[in-house]
C-alpha cells in the first residue's frame, strides 16, 4: 500500500512538472530575443542555412550562351528551390560588369545570408562569388551565371560544401538573429 501511494505521488509530481514546463514555453515572451540583443546600428541578419524548399532564387545569365538562365533555374527547381522567372541578361546594377572569369555571382541581403551560402554550396566552395548587400530587402537570392559555369554540384559535393561552410558568420554591419 505504501508503494502504491509513493508511485501515485511521483506520477502526480511528474504530471505537474510537465504542465508547468508546457505553460512556461507557451507563455514565453522572448520571441524577439535575438533581434533585441543586436547592438544599436547593426542590421539583423538571418544566417541559419534553410532547406532548399525555403529558398527563392532569381537566375540571371551573365554570359552570351542562349537560354542558360532558364536551364540553370530548371536545375535549381529539380533540387527543391523555388525560382522566379529567369532573366537572360544580368541585372541592371551589374550591366557594366564582366562575368567572363566568374562561375557565378550570388547576391543577397540580410534576410537571406544563410540562403545565399546554401546556394553557393551548389557551385562548390570558393567557386561562386558572394556579394552581400546590407541595404537589400527581401529574401530572394540573385544568381548571376558567369562564363566559367559548367554545371551545378552533385548532392555529395553540396553536402561537402555545406559541411565546409558550417554556420555562416554574419556579414559586417549585421548581427545573427538565428
Question: What spans do the regions from the language model cover?
Answer:
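Extracytoplasmic low-complexity, Pro/Thr/Ser/Ala/Gly-rich segments
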Residues: 31-93
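Extracellularly exposed regions in secreted/surface proteins, prominently low-complexity, repeat-rich
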Residues: 147-178
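Short, charged N-terminal helix-start/capping segments
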Residues: 1-4, 41-44, 170-178
